[in-house]
Amino acid sequence: MDLGTTKYIIYTELIADGYVEKHDVIGAIFGQTEGLLSNELDLRDLQKSGRIGRIDVELENINGKSFAKITLPSSLDKVETSILAATLETIDRVGPCFATVKITEVEDIRVSKRQYITNRARSILRKLMDEMIDTYEITEEIKESLRTEEIMEYGPENLPCGPNIIHSDSIIVVEGRADVLNLLRCGIKNTVAVEGTSVPKSIMELTKKKTTTAFTDGDRGGELILKELLQTCDIDYVARAPYGKEVEGTSKKELMKCLRAKVPVEQIVGNNCNGSGVIESNTPKEIVEPITPKHFEKVETPAVIEPVFKEDAIEEETIIVEPVKKAETEIIDVDATNETQSEKKFSGVKEIVDSIKNTGNVKFVVDGTEKTNTFKEFLTNIHEIKKMDFFAADMPISQKIVDLLYDKTPIIVGKEINVTKKPVNLRLFSFDEIVA
């Protein structure tokens, strides 16, 4: 149905007592209403002038009776449409059959249009609201783009840094690019990132020329980077992010608070110094004590073991505040000395190594008690084990195993040792070193 300028639709039902056809119904509508009203409301004239639309009839013949649904579009006003609807109910015959006509509804088509307009306007407005960017977001977006543009690169390593890194008298050394960006958001532009735990040479040289603050994450990784910086760079102040947080995820208020609370490096050294020019790590005190497992106490005499392990504890648990090469040389010398005494000190380990060889199992000592498991079972229960006196595995010792166990045991023995970085408080031995 083409509604066009239609305002109302008249819905009508017709029941005829006999068989009639559609053209009989149309003829009855025009024939029986003709002359009832003035010429202004004559159906034929109204249809010719377009003030009423095409009359639509749906007809069914059931058990000798005819049922019709009639729709008549009207663009007349309310009064004229009501009169026209009432006129249709005067039809009492269709062809030769008696008939009854009843108006079921007069629909104001403009109501449905208004409802459509309301619903559509609501959806359009919602879309506009979703796409609209408020002033704050526009401002932040512009600032963010400027900060990203402000990130520069320093040195041959192309390290991310702030724009004031060259001209500022003081600098802040952070871990990565995200840290530099977060500090730029807070208006701090004299930052540079080391991009990893290995400190680039350009950072080492830069810290000698400028007042340097090391600003690291408040987690284990931050501690390791800080130790590396203290070993290799000329650090003046130390600042840490809140415990468990990273610099890149810290709010402006917290960042400024952490930087204001920075402490001189001498205070860090003083709090952790043993009086011989070395800085001890922040590991628990029990790790600094002699690390001889209880399992081996009966094998070795106290007079021989005690001085050897005290020396190891000092050398292995500390960070030398000297150039890296010298520190590495000193640690290697201690290990070499230990290797010459390995047969004497670890005679009891041979039995453990022999017991797990070619089995794929692991053996560890907890409170003087030996336990044997498959490696899978050991990993399942690792969270229940806080401290071990000793750990041996019939498999190569990888960096992952070292990272998992370095804070649980002082000694790890395996088929072979394949690690790139060894914690200073950990002793690593291969089967060949133990059996030799």
From Swiss-Prot:
<keyword id="KW-0639">Primosome</keyword>
<comment type="similarity">
    <text>Belongs to the archaeal DnaG primase family.</text>
</comment>
<dbReference type="Pfam" id="PF13662">
    <property type="entry name" value="Toprim_4"/>
</dbReference>
<keyword id="KW-0548">Nucleotidyltransferase</keyword>
<dbReference type="InterPro" id="IPR050219">
    <property type="entry name" value="DnaG_primase"/>
</dbReference>
<feature type="binding site">
    <location>
        <position position="219"/>
    </location>
    <ligand>
        <name>Mg(2+) 2</name>
    </ligand>
</feature>
<dbReference type="GO" id="GO:1990077">
    <property type="term" value="C:primosome complex"/>
</dbReference>
<dbReference type="InterPro" id="IPR006171">
    <property type="entry name" value="TOPRIM_dom"/>
</dbReference>
<feature type="binding site">
    <location>
        <position position="217"/>
    </location>
    <ligand>
        <name>Mg(2+) 2</name>
    </ligand>
</feature>
<dbReference type="GO" id="GO:0005737">
    <property type="term" value="C:cytoplasm"/>
</dbReference>
<dbReference type="GO" id="GO:0000178">
    <property type="term" value="C:exosome (RNase complex)"/>
</dbReference>
<feature type="binding site">
    <location>
        <position position="217"/>
    </location>
    <ligand>
        <name>Mg(2+) 1</name>
    </ligand>
</feature>
<feature type="domain" description="Toprim">
    <location>
        <begin position="169"/>
        <end position="243"/>
    </location>
</feature>
<dbReference type="GO" id="GO:0008143">
    <property type="term" value="F:poly(A) binding"/>
</dbReference>
<dbReference type="GO" id="GO:0000428">
    <property type="term" value="C:DNA-directed RNA polymerase complex"/>
</dbReference>
<dbReference type="GO" id="GO:0003899">
    <property type="term" value="F:DNA-directed RNA polymerase activity"/>
</dbReference>
<keyword id="KW-0460">Magnesium</keyword>
<keyword id="KW-0235">DNA replication</keyword>
<comment type="subunit">
    <text>Forms a ternary complex with MCM helicase and DNA.</text>
</comment>
<comment type="function">
    <text>RNA polymerase that catalyzes the synthesis of short RNA molecules used as primers for DNA polymerase during DNA replication.</text>
</comment>
<keyword id="KW-0804">Transcription</keyword>
<dbReference type="InterPro" id="IPR034154">
    <property type="entry name" value="TOPRIM_DnaG/twinkle"/>
</dbReference>
<dbReference type="GO" id="GO:0046872">
    <property type="term" value="F:metal ion binding"/>
</dbReference>
<protein>
    <recommendedName>
        <fullName>DNA primase DnaG</fullName>
        <ecNumber>2.7.7.101</ecNumber>
    </recommendedName>
</protein>
<dbReference type="GO" id="GO:0006269">
    <property type="term" value="P:DNA replication, synthesis of primer"/>
</dbReference>
<dbReference type="InterPro" id="IPR020607">
    <property type="entry name" value="Primase_DnaG_arc"/>
</dbReference>
<keyword id="KW-0240">DNA-directed RNA polymerase</keyword>
<keyword id="KW-0479">Metal-binding</keyword>
<feature type="binding site">
    <location>
        <position position="175"/>
    </location>
    <ligand>
        <name>Mg(2+) 1</name>
    </ligand>
</feature>
<keyword id="KW-0808">Transferase</keyword>
